[in-house]
UniProtKB/Swiss-Prot annotation:
Zn(2+) binds at residues 202, 217, 220, 223. One of its GO terms (biological process) is queuosine biosynthetic process. Binds 1 zinc ion per subunit. The keyword Zinc applies. This is 7-cyano-7-deazaguanine synthase. Belongs to the QueC family. The gene is queC. SUPFAM superfamilies: Adenine nucleotide alpha hydrolases-like. Its cofactor is Zn(2+). It catalyses: 7-carboxy-7-deazaguanine + NH4(+) + ATP = 7-cyano-7-deazaguanine + ADP + phosphate + H2O + H(+).
């Protein structure tokens, strides 16, 4: 008999960004205990990892019941990903669209690697629920964000590790406006303000420029999506 989520532990892929912060709140609402995992892979916006502490502290302060559920925070360094990737997320080059139609911010295999490492850690921790912020609605066309990719990987992980992992992607069908709305649904304006102020999305790692939707350069694709989502969210609650 499979235990209900309210009695299980989840491992959340937690970068410090808007999507992963929303997924963390989603998991805290559903599971008995929640651990987090971040990756240092040589990303230009590594400042996102520094945002995690503020987000964790903020969520614990916002909801005492969430504070009791927060477990260990893990960080894995995988510099090899940057060594084998020639992308604008790991090298100091201009962000542009490649001949394939994908932006050069695409890091080949990144989510596949992240979820495989997460599953290996979950295996050791006795955890079968893994939560990620992948989304195929409002995204840059990354093939490893697609639902069919995640479902196929789940099958491979379960076969390769002889486990029954569940890969939860609560944002898969949501655009960025709906992601802001989900944060409001989970934690009210307090959570929305926490994510707006303390999460990081900008590909260039800019934290000096403050906008209505948070910090960022305001020009990169990630900032554009976040800003567009914020405007849509405001229109929905008006």
């Amino acid at each position: 008999m499979i235990d209900e989520p309210a009695s299980r532990t989840a491992l959340v892929l937690f970068s410090g960004g808007q999507d992963s912060a929303t997924c963390l709140a989603w998991a805290l609402q559903r599971f008995a205990r929640v651990e987090t995992l971040g990756f240092d892979y040589g990303q230009r916006h590594a400042i996102e990892l520094d945002c995690r502490d503020s987000l964790l502290a903020g969520m614990a302060s916002l909801r005492p019941d969430w504070a009791k559920k927060l477990g260990e925070t893990h960080t894995l360094a995988i510099p090899t990903l940057a060594e084998i990737s020639d992308t604008a997320l790991t090298r100091n080059v201009a962000i542009e669209v490649s001949e394939s139609g994908l932006p050069n911010t695409f890091v080949p295999g990144r989510n596949l690697v992240f979820l495989t490492f997460a599953a290996a850690l979950a295996y050791r921790r006795g955890v079968t629920d893994i939560v990620g912020g992948m989304c195929e609605t409002d995204y840059s066309g990354y093939p490893d964000c697609r639902d069919e990719t995640i479902r196929a990987l789940r099958i491979a992980l379960n076969l390769g590790m002889v486990r029954q992992f569940e890969l939860h992607t609560p944002l898969m069908r949501l655009d960025k406006g709906a992601t802001w709305s989900l944060a409001h649904e989970l934690g009210g304006t307090g959570l929305v303000d926490l994510i707006r102020e303390h999460s990081h999305t900008c590909y260039l790692g800019e934290r000096g420029a403050r906008h209505a939707w948070g910090y960022g350069c305001g020009e990169c694709p990630a900032c554009g999506l976040r800003a567009k989502g914020w405007r849509e969210y405001l229109a929905r609650i008006a």
